[in-house]
C-alpha cells in the first residue's frame, strides 16, 4: 500500500473532525419548545468556535448541555442537548413565571421580551434570580411547552455548547 496516497485521505479526515468539533456542528431540533422560530426536525448549523470567540449575547439561539460530558452534543454521546434562546446574561435580574420573563440589566434598563412566543398564561407566582458571572438564563420561544432555565435554573457558560448560525427547514410533501 502506498503511504503517499493515504496522506491526503488522512488529512481530509482530520480536517473534517476539526470542523465538526470546533467550527460547525449540525444539530437537529427535537420537539416544539422553540416554535414558532424553529420547528421539530429543523436542521441547525451551530458553531462551538463562535461561543469561544464571542461573548454569548441576549437573543442568541444556543445549544445547551446540562451534563459535564465534554462530548455532549455529538450523536453518540447519549446526553440530551437543548436548543434555547439566551434571554438573560450575567448581572441581569430575571423575573419569571410559567410564560412571561422580565429582564432588568445591571444598569437598570428593562428589556422587553420581543421574541416570538406561543400563547401561554402564567399559572403561578413569579420567581426572581440575579445572574452571577458566567451564568445565563435560557428559554424556549414556546414558553408553555419548554424545559428551560425556569425549570433547571441558569446555565453556566461552560454548559453552552455552541451558537446557532443557520437553520435549514427540510419539508417534503408528496
Where are the language model's segments positioned?
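N-terminal Sec-pathway targeting helices
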Residues: 1-13
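Soluble "head" domains of membrane/secretory-pathway proteins
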Residues: 6, 19-28, 34-174
